[in-house]
Amino acid sequence: MDIKLLYRLAKYLRFYKKDLIIVMISLLSVSASLLLIGSIFRDLIDRGLAEDNILSVNKSILYICLLIVILSVASFFRSYFINNVAEKIVNQIRKEAYSNLINYEIEEYEELKIGDIISRLTNDIDQIATLIVNFLSFFIRNSVMLIGSITLMFFESFKLASIVIITIPILLVPLIKFGKHVKALSKKALESKSLLVSDIDETFNNIRVIYAFNHQINKIADFDTKLQSYLIYCKTRLKIRALFFAISIAVIFLTITLIVWIGASDIVQGDLSAGQIISFIYYAIIAGVSSGGIFELLSEMHLPTTALERIITIIDKTSIVHNNYYALNNSDAISIEFKNVDFTYNSRPNLKVINNMSLKINSNKFVGIVGRSGAGKSTLIQLLLRFYRQENGTILINNQDISFVKPTDIRKFIAYVPQEASIFSDTIKSNIIFGNNKASDYEINEIIKITGIEEFSTKLHDGINTKIGEKGVRLSGGQKQRIAIARALLRKPKILLLDEAMSALDTMSEQKLLNAIKKIMKGNIIISIAHRISSIESADYILVIDKGGVVTEGSHYDLSKNSEIYRNICREQLTI
């Protein structure tokens, strides 16, 4: 068990001192009640039953009933407050992990699987709640009862108590031996469970593709393979746990049997009374159950501590922070410039996606971007948004190097519409105002009309307040793209980035919407990656990108006459 991890967890406990004091008082009350019952049993037998003293018997029974009431009330407070503290702490940890995750650099998500993130924020954190309850409730209670029962056993019989003490090292040996193996298995089990969650997430996000290719049977087989892998780790871990539990039970009950045998001899010889041996056996049972509980908890601590370790790695991971950030100049005349920019994705280190790229875009320009697949078009936009950092060269907005500007400040100037419209499982309106939650109803209604959302939203039962399902499953591709564009326009950006943002619309609808966008964005910059050449024919100029660089630029007319690459791209689209 990693003490550093437990110390880290203990830091959260300081916020709940009052609750923990109640838990500790309740724990001590429970332990004291159970231990006191042993001495009452001795009096019940030696002073009551042995002497036929019914008054003493009644008094002992009354005391036992009183202790049971105290035990019950204390158990309620212990259970309620420790579980309440555990839930508060895990929610605090979950919030910290979520807050840190959502502020990671975009490139850091390339190393993470969505299923693994979900698993860590749900299953792993639930394991931490188990760790808190087990340690602060059961472990401490059992420890107090073990120490108390052993102490009281020495008062009853030093010889018999010494026999009980000998059994503790016997139980420690297998615990230490199996501990490291169980920890490794626990880590593998959690990783395997994350793969299961990833598979479930991937399956139901792509359910239409699975249906279209009749791949249900194959997916079930793949899922079963992952499930069996997870079960193998669980089975092995549970087998070791069961073996240790069996050894513990055998040692505990053999010890109690030995105590009864030796104790019976002492009674016959007059060294112990019947009440003392009953009281001693009671304490021995408590000691056995408590030690068994402690050892079982210790054997099971590896799973939640491994989960805690996985969560701590998320909380402690820090993104690259530049200490010399400056505010971005908020001038009316906006400009963008790339100077000899190079970029390579970490996942593809041998492929230079952007290669010595240079370009300049000034205010009041509608700029089209064309190029074959993999030429670097979308990467250009993502560098501008500071999703990634260029390796070499400089990217300027308003003549400022964006490497020295907070990414959040840069994105205040920009609205981005990807080809795959990102829609949240809420209402149409909530998806639109995601771009600007301070927009007035008038502004929202105007944007809805301009983007053509009004045409289909009025046919829905609740209009723009209609719930559209997870990822907008109840909408068509074109409808989702209109919502994504409305969200971007409501933001009132200085720079609008369209990455094949109208690919699901027909040519006529696309032109109508594009004309509306140009009116709204007058005086600012529109950069549009073309799905169809027709969508950028009216652009002020077009950048032709090939192999990560700008090879030529000009109007549609000029490029059609003078650029072989551009003509080939146009020709390829006509043949599709």
Swiss-Prot record:
Domain ABC transporter: residue ranges: 336-572
Cellular location(s): Cell inner membrane
A cellular component annotation (GO) from this entry: plasma membrane
Molecular function, one GO term: ATP hydrolysis activity
Keywords attached to this entry: ATP-binding, Cell inner membrane, Cell membrane, Membrane, Nucleotide-binding, Translocase, Transmembrane, Transmembrane helix, Transport
E.C. code: 7.-.-.-
UniProt: ATP binding residues: 371-378
Location (main, coarse): membrane
PANTHER family assigned: ATP-BINDING CASSETTE SUB-FAMILY B MEMBER 10, MITOCHONDRIAL, ATP-DEPENDENT PERMEASE MDL1, MITOCHONDRIAL
Protein name: Putative export ATP-binding/permease protein RP696
UniProt organism field: Rickettsia prowazekii (strain Madrid E)
Classification lineage: Bacteria, Pseudomonadati, Pseudomonadota, Alphaproteobacteria, Rickettsiales
